[in-house]
Swiss-Prot record:
Compositional bias segments (type: Basic residues): 112-125, 142-151
Encoding gene, per UniProt annotation: tonB
GO cellular component, one term: plasma membrane
GO biological process per UniProt: protein transport
Job description of the protein: Interacts with outer membrane receptor proteins that carry out high-affinity binding and energy dependent uptake into the periplasmic space of specific substrates. It could act to transduce energy from the cytoplasmic membrane to specific energy-requiring processes in the outer membrane, resulting in the release into the periplasm of ligands bound by these outer membrane proteins.
Lineage: superkingdom: Bacteria
Protein name as it appears in the record: Protein TonB
Region (Disordered): 67-158, 183-209, 225-246
Cell compartment(s), UniProt: Cell inner membrane
Protein source organism: Mannheimia haemolytica
Length: 246
C-alpha cells in the first residue's frame, strides 16, 4: 500500500510541474517584449552622419581692440579742519549751591517725621518685648541630690558583736573565769567536806579577784587606743558621717 501511494504522489507532482512550465512558455510566446535599440547602434549612426556632412569655410572672427577709456582725474579736495571744542570751566561748589539751594522743609513736616520715627522705635521695643516673653524660658537645672551610700561593715560573723578589742586581737586566749563560792578549795566541792586546803587559799583568791577587773580595764583602754590609731582616716570620716545622718 505504501509503494502504491508513493508512486501516485510522484506521478501527480510530475504532472503539476509540467503544466506550470508549459503555461509559462506559452504566455511568453504570446506576449513578446519589443526590444529597444541598443546604445552602440545609435552612437554609430550619429558618428556616420557627422562624417557625411559637407565642410563649409568659416571666416575668422574680427579682432576687436580694447580701447581704454581715460577717466577724468578727480580734483583733490583739501581736508576740512577739525573743530576742537572749547573746554568749559567746571562749576565750583559755591556756584552749585547758589544754583540749587536746599529747600528747607516746613516745620509741620519735620514734626510729622519725628513723630513717625518715635512710633517706629516704640513699636520695635514692643515687638522685642513680646518676642522675649514668647520665648520659652529655660528651666533651672536641678542639682543632683547627693545620696550618701551606706557603708557596709567589712567584718561578718560573730566578731562584729565582740567590738574593737576583738578586731585588734582576733585570736586572743581567754583565761579561766573566777568562780566565787568554792567550798574547801575544790572547784566542785561539797559543803560537808572537811579539807583544809580551801581555807588556806581564800586570801589569795580574794586578792586576785580584786586585781583582775582593774587589769581588764587597763588592757581594754590600751587596745582601744591601738585600734583607733590603726583605723584608716577615710573609714573613720565615713563612720562619723554615717552616725551623724542616723
Amino acid at each position: 500500500m505504501k509503494k502504491k501511494h508513493s508512486r501516485i504522489g510522484l506521478l501527480a507532482s510530475l504532472a503539476i510541474h509540467t503544466a506550470l512550465i508549459g503555461g509559462t512558455f506559452a504566455w511568453l510566446h504570446n506576449h513578446k517584449v519589443k526590444k529597444l535599440p541598443s546604445k552602440t547602434l545609435f552612437l554609430w549612426k550619429w558618428w556616420q552622419a557627422l562624417l557625411d556632412e559637407p565642410q563649409v569655410a568659416v571666416a575668422p572672427d574680427p579682432i576687436t581692440e580694447e580701447v581704454k577709456e581715460i577717466e577724468p582725474e578727480k580734483a583733490e579736495v583739501p581736508p576740512e579742519p577739525k573743530l576742537t571744542p572749547e573746554p568749559t570751566p567746571e562749576p565750583d561748589e559755591f556756584q552749585i549751591l547758589r544754583l540749587n539751594p536746599k529747600k528747607e522743609k516746613p516745620k509741620e513736616e519735620k514734626r510729622k517725621e519725628r513723630h513717625h520715627h518715635k512710633h517706629k522705635h516704640r513699636h520695635k521695643e514692643k515687638r522685642e518685648e513680646l518676642q522675649e516673653q514668647e520665648k520659652p524660658k529655660d528651666k533651672p537645672k536641678e542639682r543632683p541630690k547627693h545620696h550618701h551610700k551606706h557603708i557596709k561593715a567589712l567584718d561578718a560573723g560573730p566578731e562584729i558583736k565582740q567590738g574593737i578589742v576583738a578586731k585588734a586581737i582576733p585570736n586572743a586566749a581567754e583565761g579561766e573565769k573566777v568562780v566565787a563560792g568554792v567550798v574547801g578549795g575544790q572547784k566542785n566541792g561539797s559543803p560537808n567536806s572537811t579539807s583544809t586546803t580551801g581555807s588556806a587559799n581564800t586570801g589569795a583568791s580574794s586578792g586576785n579577784a580584786s586585781e583582775l577587773p582593774a587589769y581588764k580595764v587597763a588592757l581594754q583602754r590600751a587596745l582601744q587606743r591601738k585600734a583607733n590609731n590603726s583605723y584608716p582616716q577615710r573609714e573613720k570620716m565615713n563612720a562619723e558621717n554615717r552616725y551623724s545622718y542616723d
